[in-house]
């Protein structure tokens, strides 16, 4: 599977509906977006915990209401895109086609899980279309306890150098369905993960040769900033 990292965002704001729709247009298998919880309990799609990098005003997400965030225009390369707003999870879910995937990266803590599960259950999205991902083991653990029907992956930087067996044991302890890592890893690492019965997913891969190598090793998905290149 080829997954568009924050959508296609070279000339469109990242994590915007426009960037996600551009991804569907080139034939990706899924999109990856980042999500935070607002002060008034809405779930919004934005990578950072504040708006300074992607808007012309700095608001902290968890201290802001949805209405306050919706007043901002998203930027790309320092330029405002008029009427391109920070989307809600509801808005993103509505544009996911049948049979396609959405990788939901949780960028805050476990406080998002209850509203997230409610939002997913109200949407047209089938549970098989959803993959929840997080660097926070507690988020993965509690998600699987609350809603085991959703696939959940623990994100991990291979450069941390941890023993594969220890990492696999942790995956089973928190009931994760698999692991997502960067691409600086060995074939042995991937094989051990897969042999254990866990899924292996790769991020963020923008080179076709690297992507093909990881696929040949058994990677279930490739998350990329260059979906058009990898689809060719």
What positions do the PLM features span?
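Phosphate-group recognition and catalysis centered on beta-loop-alpha active-site segments
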Residues: 1-232
């Amino acid at each position: 599977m080829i997954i568009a990292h924050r959508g296609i965002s070279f000339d469109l704001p990242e994590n915007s509906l426009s960037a996600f729709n551009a991804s569907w247009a080139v034939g990706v298998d899924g999109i990856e977006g980042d999500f935070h919880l607002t002060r008034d309990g809405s779930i919004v799609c934005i990578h950072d915990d504040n708006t300074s990098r992607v808007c012309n005003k700095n608001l902290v997400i968890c201290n802001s209401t949805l209405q306050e965030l919706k007043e901002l225009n998203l930027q790309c390369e320092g330029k405002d895109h008029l009427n391109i707003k920070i989307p809600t999870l509801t808005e993103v879910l509505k544009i996911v086609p049948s049979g396609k995937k959405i990788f939901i990266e949780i960028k805050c803590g476990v406080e998002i899980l209850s509203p997230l599960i409610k939002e997913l259950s109200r949407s047209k999205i089938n549970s098989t279309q959803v993959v929840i991902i997080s660097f926070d083991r507690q988020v993965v653990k509690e998600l699987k306890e609350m809603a085991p029907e959703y696939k959940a992956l623990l994100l991990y930087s291979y450069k941390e150098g941890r023993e594969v067996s220890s990492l696999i044991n942790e995956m089973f302890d928190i009931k994760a369905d698999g692991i997502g890592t960067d691409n600086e890893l060995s074939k042995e690492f991937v094989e051990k993960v897969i042999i254990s019965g866990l899924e292996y997913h790769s991020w963020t891969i923008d080179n076709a040769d690297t992507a093909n190598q990881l696929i040949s090793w058994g990677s279930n998905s490739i998350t990329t900033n260059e979906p058009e290149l990898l689809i060719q």
